[in-house]
Amino acid sequence: MSYGGSASQDIVTKLIRKIQNTSVSCTRRDENLDSFNQHLKMSLKVAHNTKTFAKHCLHRQVFKNTYRKRKAVEDQRKNLNTQLRQKFASPSDNLLSPCSRKLNDHKSKLFSAKSQPKTLEFVRGKQNIPRKPNVDI
């Protein structure tokens, strides 16, 4: 190898070796840093998961009981309402015959059901009918 100039072959080889050694040591440092960074990332992830888990546990302890109590109260209220509806009897129920009761139940079902009324199109019907002049004979 001839490099020209005043530098001797020895100096050039020393520089090449020095560059190779520093590049090797840099890659080793990078590998060490990568493993350290990976370890650091994993430990941070575990710490975050633990913190999140503790946060959710605390939230669950605080709010789960109130939710259960509220749910139980709502269920109890619904049960009482259904029992009251089933037990309620109007004063006229004793006066009605079984047939009249059935008719009243049927009427209440008909009127409580939502229905869609039919549209009446009288205007169109009149326009479609051809008009003939009145001829008196």
UniProtKB/Swiss-Prot annotation:
Keywords: Cell cycle. Component of the FEAR (CDC14 early anaphase release) network which promotes CDC14 release from the nucleolus during early anaphase and is required for the efficient segregation of telomeric and nucleolar regions. Although BNS1 can partially compensate for a lack of SPO12 function when overexpressed, it does not appear to play any role in controlling meiotic nuclear division. The lineage of its organism: Eukaryota, Fungi, Dikarya, Ascomycota, Saccharomycotina. It comes from Saccharomyces cerevisiae (strain ATCC 204508 / S288c). Pfam families: Spo12. The keyword Cell cycle applies. It comes from the Eukaryota. This is Protein BNS1. InterPro entries: Spo12. GO terms for biological process: meiotic cell cycle; negative regulation of protein localization to nucleolus.
